[in-house]
């Protein structure tokens, strides 16, 4: 059974182990720590093991923004990213929820489109040669 909950400081080490980017990007560890301490990080757990996580903030021009969404490869294609995004939609305190992904990340683009997100813009130069595609969903309250 997969459960969703707020991340706790005790989860930070497991989150670092879960996310391969934390090995190559020195900014990831402080980001995960800050997101956890500010209660913006939510984790998915199965049999006591962290299998995915995401970060929802409200700092994108005062709108909700899913800054990060990650599911371990062994647990992909099981609708867990969908479940996490819907969880964030329910928690979002604004009428619009934004998120983004690299142009190279076709599965994330397909996920956002399937969930009713619309392309809202492009940010160049974050990752060289791989623009960031911004998505928005208007939430009904």
Which residues does each predicted region cover?
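Acetyl-CoA-dependent GNAT
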Residues: 2, 6-68, 72, 85, ...
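Active-site acidic-Proline motif in GNAT/NAT acetyltransferases
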Residues: 58, 72-78, 103-104
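Short acidic/polar active-site loop segments enriched in Thr and Asp
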Residues: 62, 95, 118
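Conserved acetyl-CoA-binding loop-helix of GNAT-fold acetyltransferases
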Residues: 71, 77-90, 110, 114
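Accessory recognition modules or surfaces
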Residues: 78-85, 97, 131-140
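Conserved GNAT acetyl-CoA-binding A-motif
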Residues: 85, 91-103
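Conserved catalytic-core motifs of GNAT/GCN5-like acyltransferases
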Residues: 98-101, 118-134
């Amino acid at each position: 059974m997969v459960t969703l909950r707020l991340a706790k400081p005790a989860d930070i080490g497991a989150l670092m182990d879960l996310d391969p980017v934390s090995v190559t990007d020195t900014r990831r560890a402080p980001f995960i720590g800050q997101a956890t301490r500010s209660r913006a990080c939510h984790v998915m757990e199965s049999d006591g093991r962290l299998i995915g996580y995401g970060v929802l903030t409200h700092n994108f021009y005062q709108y909700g923004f899913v800054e990060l969404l990650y599911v371990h490869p062994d647990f992909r294609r099981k609708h867990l990213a969908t479940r996490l995004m819907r969880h964030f939609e329910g928690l979002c305190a604004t009428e619009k929820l934004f998120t983004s992904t690299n142009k190279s990340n076709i599965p994330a683009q397909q996920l956002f489109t399937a969930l009713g997100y619309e392309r809202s813009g492009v940010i160049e130069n974050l990752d060289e040669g791989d623009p960031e595609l911004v998505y928005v969903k208007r939430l009904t309250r």
